[in-house]
Swiss-Prot record:
Thiol-specific peroxidase that catalyzes the reduction of hydrogen peroxide and organic hydroperoxides to water and alcohols, respectively. Plays a role in cell protection against oxidative stress by detoxifying peroxides and as sensor of hydrogen peroxide-mediated signaling events. Acts as a scavenger of H(2)O(2). The keyword Nucleotide-binding does not apply. GO terms for biological process: cell redox homeostasis; cellular detoxification of hydrogen peroxide; cellular response to oxidative stress; hydrogen peroxide catabolic process. One of its GO terms (molecular function) is thioredoxin peroxidase activity. This is Peroxiredoxin bcp1. Residues 46-168 form the Thioredoxin domain. Its main location: cytoplasm. The gene is bcp1.
Length: 195
């Protein structure tokens, strides 16, 4: 009895094998599996309610700062700026500087973040007398996880995030925001006041 006719496309996908008696047996056609659906829970950017990434980055002096060590004991505001020592970034940084005593009184810490090197961060901090640390993230490890990297890479949206004391959960995520609005909104959340 003849084998059932198969299309040439399918026949090309079937390999022949020999059984123990040397008889040719067609091997079953490979099973075509659908690509698994993208798991939305594996989104690479942090969302409100997510825990702060367990990342350690150098500050302006090259000292390693582990984010979860801070949020274990204090709330945390991270503000991201495109480039150290530029006008908008200076406004944003100085706004957090000027409100820093009140932010600390509310049991929060502040960190600045950009792609800049530790050396550039040091010059920026010293020139503006910032009382908080500036994180250097030239590879964008944290910037990407926070969702602030612009399409094409290497640049970021001015942004800020607020993380809860103890749990490290993100309670505010503001991406692509103006310098002064960033400060006002973050300060309002921290101090439970109107922006």
């Amino acid at each position: 009895m003849d084998a059932p006719r198969r299309s040439s496309r399918l026949a090309a996908k079937i390999a022949n094998v020999l059984d123990s008696k040397g008889t040719i047996i067609p091997e079953a056609a490979p099973v075509m599996l659908k690509k698994p659906a993208k798991d939305e829970s594996v989104d690479s950017t942090i969302q409100v309610g997510d825990v702060i990434p367990d990342i350690t980055l150098p500050d302006e002096d090259g000292t390693s700062i582990r984010l979860r060590d801070i949020t274990a004991n204090k709330g945390l505001v991270i503000f991201a700026y495109p480039k150290a020592s530029t006008p908008g970034c200076t406004k944003q940084g100085c706004g957090f500087r000027d409100n820093y005593p009140k932010i600390q009184a509310s049991d929060y810490e502040v960190l600045g973040l950009s792609f800049d090197t530790s050396k550039a961060q040091k010059a920026f901090k010293d020139k503006q007398n910032f009382p908080y640390h500036l994180l250097s993230d030239p590879k964008g490890e944290l910037i990407k996880k926070l969702g602030a990297e612009k399409p094409g890479g290497g640049k970021l949206f001015r942004s800020h995030w607020i993380f809860e004391k103890g749990t490290g959960k993100c309670i505010v995520k503001e991406i692509d925001i103006s310098p002064l609005v960033s400060v006002d909104k973050a300060f309002a959340v921290i101090t439970d006041s109107e922006p």
